[in-house]
Amino acid sequence: EGFGLTTAESVMAETPIIVNVTGGMQDQCGFRKKSDGKLFTANDYAKIGSLHNYREWEDKVTHGEWVKPVWSRVQTMTGSVPTPYIIDDKVDVPEVSEAIRYWYDKGKEGREKAGKAGRNAFLNEIGLGVDNQNKCMADGIEKAIKNFKPKKRFNLYKLA
């Protein structure tokens, strides 16, 4: 899934998550740079593109206490004429089982504490609360209107 709505709903319900580090699910991990402790922003992702490459990023970031991220170890690319490429991430099954065990070993109280921390982070610093989402939507619409450039007109001709 591109954004990970089910995992976002899970965190908002104060349930910890296990996610593949891919697409929008990266945003739900609360990744921070180890170098300065700052949360990755949309501008950071615009510069780097993605944290997909575990070789480059796994040791350079930390994550929120509500998530156990699982990094893709293999990526395949397929495609067709209508969809030129689709990148498919493959995780290491033993690593997934370790993540499940991690949450199991945390116990009920540990999972509840982590879930509450996740919901709090989503509503505040990560910005998934309704007020921030409305502001981002309004800002995006304003930016689209401000930067709109009409396409050059063209004529259609009927050939006999």
Residue ranges, per PLM feature:
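Conserved Class I S-adenosyl-L-methionine
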Residues: 41-43
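Short catalytic/ligand-binding loop motif for oxyanion handling, primarily in non-cytosolic enzymes
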Residues: 4, 25-29, 122
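Short alpha-helical segment that forms part of, or immediately flanks, the ligand-binding pocket
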Residues: 8-12, 16, 23-27
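Short, solvent-exposed loop/turn segments at secondary-structure junctions
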Residues: 1-2, 17, 23-24, 75, ...
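Conserved acidic donor-binding loop of glycosyltransferase catalytic domains
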Residues: 20-21, 27, 45, 49, ...
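Short glycine/acidic-rich beta->alpha loop that forms part of the nucleotide-sugar donor binding site
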Residues: 1-4, 11
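Short hydrophobic beta-strand element within catalytic cores of glycosyltransferases
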Residues: 16-19, 30, 36-38
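C-terminal amphipathic helix plus adjacent low-complexity
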Residues: 52-160
